[in-house]
Amino acid sequence: MLLRYLKKIFYNSVAELRFPSGDANLCTSSLYYDALISAAYLAKELGKGNNVANTYRKQASTLRKNIETYFGSTVEGYSTYAYYKGNDVLRSWICIPLTMGIDERKEGTIQALFSPRLWTENGLLTQAGSETFWDRSTLYALRGVYAAGETEKATEYLQRYSKTRLLGEHVPYAIEAWPEGEQRHLSAESGLYGRIITEGLFGIRPIGFKSFTLTPRLPQKWNQMALHHVRAFGADFDLMIQRQGAGKLQVIMTTSQGKKKVYNLKEGKTITINLK
């Protein structure tokens, strides 16, 4: 159902109304790419066979190339993406490819995101030169910068955002938009803040009903980080990430039944955890 909906809006491009989005936009295309990757995992889990899963993977590969060809552009001097064909002003949604694992233009995109044209004390402007900011794109961006492996940069700006918006003068939740509604929109963006931690810092990616990949991004100043009582994949477990020396990490997973698994890996690498 989700894949069908994303495919529909991929071709029809739902109008955003508040800012121009063109006939096809970067955000919807990137979301559809990630949905195809997830559909491939799901097809395998449901026993649909390798042919179905491989079809989704091939479609994702083709779409990734087309995203680069169609949206890849130099905008305001940055090697990043045009949000839609003909767009020549930086938009916060250039972060979405990073969040979805598309990193061909990560260097220029990260530079643009944290440039004075987009970054403010409240996070990202929706469009360079405007006064509007949507927490949604800021939270996606921080998660995407972690996913791209720029841990120190992501942590620096996560701390800045958190200090201003969680500890400074603020409403006590992530907001839909500003200046629209004067920050009164309580929205699902609060959940996106949590996903910076689970999917950004810890790099959790579901690949099955009882399995996931883990790509931990432990900041250099931290010796360890942990998630306790993760209730997912049909289980209740703790995750502990510890530094084991230069470039080396150790992952300790402990289930609520006391079963423990230990994994050793190099920084930036990915492991698969199976809870079956």
Please name every model-derived segment:
Residues 65:
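Short, well-ordered surface patches within globular domains
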